[in-house]
Swiss-Prot record:
Positions of region (Disordered): 140-161
GO cellular component, one term: cytosol
Subcellular location: Cytoplasm
Similarity-based family: Belongs to the SmpB family.
PANTHER family, per database record: SSRA-BINDING PROTEIN (PTHR30308:SF2), TMRNA-BINDING COMPONENT OF TRANS-TRANSLATION TAGGING COMPLEX (PTHR30308)
Lineage of the species this protein comes from: Bacteria, Pseudomonadati, Pseudomonadota, Alphaproteobacteria, Sphingomonadales
The name this protein goes by in its record: SsrA-binding protein
Ranges in coiled-coil conformation: none
């Protein structure tokens, strides 16, 4: 018998790959959720928790959005039908969202950065894509100072209370 899922369990997403460095290196303007067109062996490899998006980016090309340089290693049992690990992968977005992304990239200094790859509650592979602007070195130092201050403040409040 199938156990009914609670609302909290239903909304959970299984994160496969995360680009934690992106939140430090870029000022995130807007976040989009995009589907990703994958081959069968790529899905199997992702379900095993393999894959990295640390050095990847996305670009708008000919009215389509492509994920470039994302590494999904070959599936170990995929024999001759395996995929190429770093091939460009098409991202599935609404045309309005593609227009927003294209307009954002056309502006000076904006780029498309993947933040995470995950499986949603329906088992579909999704990419969390951010329209972001690169931070300067002094902005990064400011972020570090702010993070340290928050940590010290929490420590002081914890000791006091």
């Amino acid at each position: 018998m199938v156990r009914p899922q609670s609302a909290a369990e239903f909304d959970k997403k299984k994160v496969v790959a995360e680009n934690r460095r992106a939140r430090f290196d870029y000022a995130i303007e807007q976040v989009f959720e995009a589907g990703i067109a994958l081959q069968g062996t790529e899905v199997k490899s992702l379900r095993f928790g393999e894959g990295t998006i640390a050095e990847s980016y996305a670009e708008v090309n000919g009215g389509e959005v492509w994920l470039i340089n994302a590494n999904i290693p070959e599936f170990s049992h995929g024999n001759r039908f395996n995929h190429e690990p770093k091939r460009p992968r098409k991202l599935l977005l609404n045309w309005r969202e593609i227009n927003k992304l294209h307009a954002g990239v056309a502006r000076q200094g904006m780029t498309l950065v993947p933040l995470s790859v995950y499986f949603n509650s329906r088992g579909r592979a999704k990419v969390e894509l951010a329209l972001a602007k690169g931070k300067k070195a002094h902005d990064k130092r400011e972020s570090i100072k702010e993070r340290d201050w928050k940590r010290d403040k929490q420590r002081l409040l914890k000791d006091r209370g």
